[in-house]
Amino acid sequence: MKQAIAGVVAFDEEITVMIVYPSIAGAPGGIGKILGRLFNIQIGIKPLTVGNLIALASAPLCAGLWIGRVLPMNRLPIIGTLSKKLGLAPQRYRITTKAILSEDAFDGSTVQETIALDSFDEIEIAVDAGQSWYDCGDLIFKQAGAVTGRLESVSRPESFKAACIKSQMSFVGVKQAI
């Protein structure tokens, strides 16, 4: 059985530590962020606020956006071509024992971005107004103040940041020991 902890497996092996799917706040065209801003409207008496009523009415649209972010719609013959043109290719963020990857959500066959675990020393979380309702944010990776990578609309960014930092500390510690 393979362990998903840097330093426990052989240093040259790459094992998955954690996988997270982006929130629908990152949907193309900014529609997810627009909906998030609308859902945050607190006019009214809770739980019957304007934002909650808009969220209820737009549930089918949000379900469609979520399905488009997770399921491999880009692999279907006719819908796939359209989804690629609209930027609806589903993706996921995966922490391994060597890097943080932004890749194809279905099978990880296409990697869009790679952030090596030794290429950052700080991670910032930037939460846009349209992202706060979804409990998501952008993770900005920095090395000596310079941006080395960015992951957009990460669900529950605090826990993903903690996992990134733990993996980075383990990787760098093992690398220095070897």
Predicted feature locations:
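N-terminal basic, Ser/Thr-rich segments that initiate or prime the first beta/alpha elements at protein or domain
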Residues: 1-178
